[in-house]
């Protein structure tokens, strides 16, 4: 299996779109997650991340420039008990609400499809981290159109039990830049998680995202034993 460094992987593309990273810290004591957004249009770049308790939402940086809040204003992060949900759209709420009714992550996402932003039909990417019995597991999902055909939805879920320390999985919306934008292909990528503080990891990710296209970054460390969290947010718009 190919294991990439965060720097090499992020530098491999100028435009990942939106990306989710989930893994276990090198010391095995923390669950680690990151979510970033990139943008090419004025509307997409006109955003910031705002923390609301344990949750996080997107917000227009300049309300006067907001053209269409559809698909770009949502909660990327919500916490339900011992579960942390991270997604690139309002499916965060779908997962939260249906898991709260005892449905599974995969069942909740059966009610959703890719985004309706023709011709890209941006994939919906999602992740959930669960702490239990002194350990952690997580799952990732991507919902995407079949070769750009909006009548067909392909659904992939990847589950990771007792993940290896010092490793993370990375999934993002686009395979490369283009018009239309080609959807992510294959399994989530495997990244090396260095033995660093949350501030150092945040800086590592932010520094290696494309300078022109990066918009915002969220990083969280979750203590597997206690559930205590450390969170960092970086916004290009200030």
Model-derived segments and spans:
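Conserved short alpha-helical segments that host acidic/polar catalytic motifs at enzyme active sites
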Residues: 1-238
């Amino acid at each position: 299996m190919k294991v990439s460094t965060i720097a090499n992987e992020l530098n491999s593309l100028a435009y990942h779109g939106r990306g989710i990273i989930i893994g276990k810290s090198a010391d095995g004591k923390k669950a680690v997650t990151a979510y970033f957004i990139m943008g090419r249009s004025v509307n997409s770049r006109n955003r910031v991340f705002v923390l609301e308790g344990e949750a996080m939402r997107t917000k227009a940086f300049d309300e006067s420039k907001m053209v269409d809040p559809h698909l770009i204003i949502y909660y990327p992060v919500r916490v339900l008990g011992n579960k942390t949900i991270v997604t690139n759209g309002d499916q965060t709420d779908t997962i939260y609400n249906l898991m709260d009714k005892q449905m599974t992550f995969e069942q909740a996402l059966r009610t959703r499809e890719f985004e309706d932003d023709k011709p890209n039909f941006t994939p919906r990417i999602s992740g959930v981290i669960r702490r239990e019995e002194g350990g952690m597991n997580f799952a990732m999902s991507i919902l995407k159109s079949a070769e750009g055909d909006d009548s067909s939805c392909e659904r992939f879920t990847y589950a990771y039990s007792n993940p290896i320390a010092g490793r993370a999985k990375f999934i993002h919306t686009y395979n490369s830049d283009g018009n239309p934008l080609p959807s992510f292909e294959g399994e989530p990528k495997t990244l090396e998680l260095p033995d660093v503080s949350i501030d150092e990891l945040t800086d590592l990710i932010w520094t290696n995202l494309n300078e022109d296209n990066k918009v915002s970054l969220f990083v969280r460390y979750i203590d597997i034993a206690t559930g205590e969290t450390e969170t960092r947010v970086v916004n290009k718009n200030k």
